[in-house]
Amino acid sequence: MSRDDQLFTLWGKLNDRQKDNFLKWMKAFDVEKTYQKTSGDIFNDDFFDIFGDRLITHHFSSTQALTKTLFEHAFNDSLNESGVISSLAESRTNPGHDITIDSIKVALKTEAAKNISKSYIHVSKWMELGKGEWILELLLERFLEHLENYERIFTLRYFKISEYKFSYQLVEIPKSLLLEAKNAKLEIMSGSKQSPKPGYGYVLDENENKKFSLYFDGGAERKLQIKHLNLEHCIVHGVWDFILPPP
């Protein structure tokens, strides 16, 4: 039975409500959209089409950005469907890589804040810092050890431009850039009322300009954030732009 025959047969089995939902879902693929491959060595043209279709399928039933877990699965499925060998890490609480692509361990991040910057990346939770000693030098060492668990890092950034217009951006954060944190200038925020007191690790270029900051958050989660990471130091692999029709 051909694909068209299968669709016709299935259509006849749906009730009116299911047919209405099916039509809405099909119309999702007819939205105004642009998929741009801008750089990179892993992804082929098929991946950008497949992943873009998965993004629009998600937004057929949700007004929220793709969560990290949904990103991981959509990313992995799109890679495999496009002919790239990929598999998710077996443990979802793995303190390192999230996915393996052609035998390369990769960490995945997402960013979807309402006030997201076009020029600077912010990762609100890079890793948990645990309940050990709160000494910035030791925390920095833990971050550098964490980097040993993966070779590449990709973050999916979501921009809501208007009620019906949104965009996704796939960016690679070079591991070599993050490794520059070994020379970070550490500063404890002594005036903070938080306990333990938070601190910063500033990564500067040769002209003392800030490349990015490590923020050791001493709050309830005790986590490491990456702040003010200039997009100019990263690789934008692709952009997906969508304009949805009004309901």
From Swiss-Prot:
Enzyme Commission number(s): 3.1.21.4
Native species: Serratia marcescens
Higher taxonomy: Bacteria, Pseudomonadati, Pseudomonadota, Gammaproteobacteria, Enterobacterales
GO biological process, one term: DNA restriction-modification system
Molecular function (Gene Ontology), one example: type II site-specific deoxyribonuclease activity
InterPro entries for this protein: SmaI (IPR049519)
Keywords for the protein's UniProt record, in alphabetical order: Endonuclease, Hydrolase, Magnesium, Nuclease, Restriction system
Protein name: Type II restriction enzyme SmaI
Disulfide-bond pairs as recorded: none
Entry cofactors: Mg(2+); K(+)
Catalysis: reaction(s): Endonucleolytic cleavage of DNA to give specific double-stranded fragments with terminal 5'-phosphates
